[in-house]
């Protein structure tokens, strides 16, 4: 009986790759909710994906589920004409019902919170880099982590914590845990570090990677060939790493599509992922939520390892420092 209880209490982790599977997972858990849904979101567009999620939440609210949404105002800059807040003015349809439903609460403000998190009934935690918009559902490469663990949901709601096999790390309010956790995680690598990230420019992270390469650790980096922003900053980082790393221990690849994932894989069997980007603003200033998963969650780690290997096969290697014009270096300095 004790063994059965331990198995039941052990967190269960599932990985969804890309938007089709990720949004199917999100809708599934919204559909299963019975009491409470809590959502933290950066970008939420008024497009087919945004309306699909709103409709799903409306159905949950109609069942008596309380829905609490925290929407970051800074994300509005990325919503353009599909702005979330303007849907409040809708006089009919899904958005009118959404904003006027007594069981739906929307908290909107400038808090600098970049996290994308869902909690369902204090039992399920969904952590991702995906905003609610069509490009995340249909076009961009990204990851969602589903964790069934009341203890981890409580850790999220109370500002961070851990179970025996999972560590939730956050930047929130006065808590800034992401940089220290990432620093320690990278420095613990003995054999390999694999980064699959959209944006890479933080000076300390670059320095750690170069030092680890000289210590014999194999460094593999996968970046998007055509990111939505930060391209020249990425290329300056690539140039710096090629110059300062031990070349035989450094491989850099450019993925052909836009990848938005934030995966840091250490020695194949530990991973740190979530919403945090490898740029100073994200690591230090913005609200972020990341999860550190250890080797005991074998199935999830196998899926992440397999995904990374397939992504490398789709990518082209960078064999020499990129050539950058003076104006491109200025754009890189501006983190563009």
Question: Which residue ranges define each predicted feature?
Answer:
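Gly/Ala-rich phosphate-binding loop of Rossmann-like dinucleotide-binding domains
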Residues: 61, 213-214
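Long, C-terminal catalytic modules of enzymes
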Residues: 269-336
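A structural signal for leucine-rich repeat
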Residues: 208-210
């Amino acid at each position: 009986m004790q063994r059965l209880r331990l198995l039941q209490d052990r967190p269960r982790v599932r990985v969804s790759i890309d938007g089709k599977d990720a949004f199917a997972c999100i809708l599934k858990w919204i559909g299963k909710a019975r009491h409470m849904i809590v959502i933290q979101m950066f970008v939420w567009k008024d497009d087919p994906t945004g309306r699909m999620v709103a409709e799903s939440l409306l159905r949950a609210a109609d069942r008596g589920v309380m829905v609490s949404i925290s929407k970051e105002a800074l994300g509005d800059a990325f919503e353009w004409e599909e702005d979330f807040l303007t849907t409040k003015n809708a006089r009919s349809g899904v958005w009118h019902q959404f904003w006027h439903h007594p069981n739906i609460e929307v908290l909107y403000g400038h808090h600098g919170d970049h996290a994308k998190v869902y909690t369902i009934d204090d039992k399920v935690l969904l952590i991702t880099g995906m905003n609610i918009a069509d490009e995340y559902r249909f076009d961009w490469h990204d990851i969602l982590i589903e964790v069934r663990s009341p203890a981890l949901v409580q850790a999220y709601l109370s500002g961070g914590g851990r179970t025996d096999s999972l560590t939730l790390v956050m930047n929130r309010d006065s808590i800034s845990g992401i940089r220290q956790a990432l620093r320690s995680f990278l420095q613990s690598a003995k054999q390999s570090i694999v980064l699959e990230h959209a944006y890479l420019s933080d000076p300390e992270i670059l320095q750690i990677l170069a030092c680890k390469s000289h210590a014999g650790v194999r460094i593999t980096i996968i970046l998007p060939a055509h990111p939505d922003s930060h391209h020249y900053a990425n290329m300056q980082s690539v140039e710096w790493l090629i110059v300062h790393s031990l070349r035989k221990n450094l491989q850099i690849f450019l993925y052909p599509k836009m990848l938005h994932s934030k995966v840091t894989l250490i020695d194949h069997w530990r991973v740190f992922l979530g919403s945090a980007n490898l740029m100073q603003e994200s690591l230090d200033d913005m609200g972020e939520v990341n999860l550190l998963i250890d080797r005991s969650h074998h199935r999830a780690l196998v899926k992440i390892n397999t995904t990374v290997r397939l992504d490398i096969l789709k990518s082209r290697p960078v064999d020499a420092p990129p050539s950058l014009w003076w104006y491109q270096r200025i754009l890189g300095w501006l983190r563009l």
